[in-house]
């Protein structure tokens, strides 16, 4: 399936990881990253209320709709190996993270992830702090982040420092509002941000600028939809 053109959400990053042992540290770091970067990290697992029979189908959909995928191979988890193989098969760009403390004792010749790791670049971390630093570097290097920052630099020309700070926070909240759905009615998006103490005029102004820059599409009209582009 590699090489087949696929449609994906430009700012969505799939995260595959051991659910009980590794997920909590990622969720803590991601909560901070999503306040700073325009990326949405998609983690799918049992706690989402989905039964096991449908879980992998949902995971495959999330992988295929993501612009990039991160897999934490700490412990040689079989599910992570399976998800990695699927991402590789459909040509999703991917990165492997590995907890260095457990690497030697867990990644033996019998580990299910070992064949997938052969020859692949890995980001190793010994502490949660190092993991956070590596994930922040990853965020900065993503194509959508670069396009987003370029769009903001253009949109904020001539603004005061305080106005830039307010508008940057608004821009992040705009993309955060679109995390859970492919698109959102423009009117609902504006109302959502008005509830967070933003004026309709400033929301509309930034929507127009982001639309013109191509990082978010939102036409004008009663039934217009907004979506990440």
What are these regions (language model features)?
Residues 1-229:
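Conserved catalytic or regulatory cores that recognize and/or transform ribose-phosphate-containing ligands
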